[in-house]
Amino acid sequence: MSSQNQDLVVVGKLGATYGIKGWLKVFSYTEQSESIFAYQPWLIKVKGEWKPIQIESWKKHGQGMVAKLEGLDIREDAQIFTNAEVAVHADQLPALSGEEFYWRELYGMSVVTTEGYDLGKVTDILETGSNDVLVVKANLKDAFGQKERLIPFLDEQVIKSIDRTAQRIEVDWDPGF
């Protein structure tokens, strides 16, 4: 990804075409699914390149949503966007307070125990329903033989601090798990 694209945040994905007038199904990754339409323009990844496109209209359809993108007036024109990712520039996202952060900020951060043991780096975050879970890829020569750790994201109980500047998360966690 070029440095110009590093500030992009994927907020959804386009699905199959809907009808004959160029509408597409929309799958939102935003917390409130409809808020994906508050961001303009969308950047759509087609053949490896991000292209800006405006939303002409959108509506709920059954359990999901569909959108009409500017310049797509027939089904055949819209088909090229089937399964394409939808991104926006990171600076379009709402500002957060000092204690809040976006999950994307955690990726790549080092995870260290309160005793100073380096557990590895965050590679993914799982949503489990009760609480989110950090997926931490262990260092190659992990003293405990771990390749990956799943650490529950329980603020104060497990997660002791997050330092954006140092790119570090301090946890109260047994390195043997």
From Swiss-Prot:
Protein's UniProt keywords contain Chaperone: yes
Listed Pfam families: PRC, RimM
Entry's transmembrane regions: none
Protein localization: Cytoplasm
Keywords in alphabetical order: Chaperone, Cytoplasm, Ribosome biogenesis, rRNA processing
Gene3D superfamilies per record: PRC-barrel domain, RimM
Chain segments annotated as coiled-coil in the UniProt record: none
GO annotation, cellular component aspect: cytoplasm; ribosome
InterPro entries associated with the record: PRC-brl_dom, PRC_barrel-like_sf, RimM, RimM_N, RimM_N_sf, Transl_B-barrel_sf
GO terms, biological process: ribosomal small subunit biogenesis; rRNA processing
Domain PRC barrel span(s) in chain numbering: 98-177
Molecular function in Gene Ontology: ribosome binding
Xref: HAMAP family: Ribosome_mat_RimM (MF_00014)
Binding partners and assembly: Binds ribosomal protein uS19.
UniProt record similarity statement: Belongs to the RimM family.
Description of its domains: The PRC barrel domain binds ribosomal protein uS19.
Known function: An accessory protein needed during the final step in the assembly of 30S ribosomal subunit, possibly for assembly of the head region. Essential for efficient processing of 16S rRNA. May be needed both before and after RbfA during the maturation of 16S rRNA. It has affinity for free ribosomal 30S subunits but not for 70S ribosomes.
Descriptive protein name: Ribosome maturation factor RimM
Organism taxonomic ancestry: Bacteria, Pseudomonadati, Pseudomonadota, Gammaproteobacteria, Vibrionales
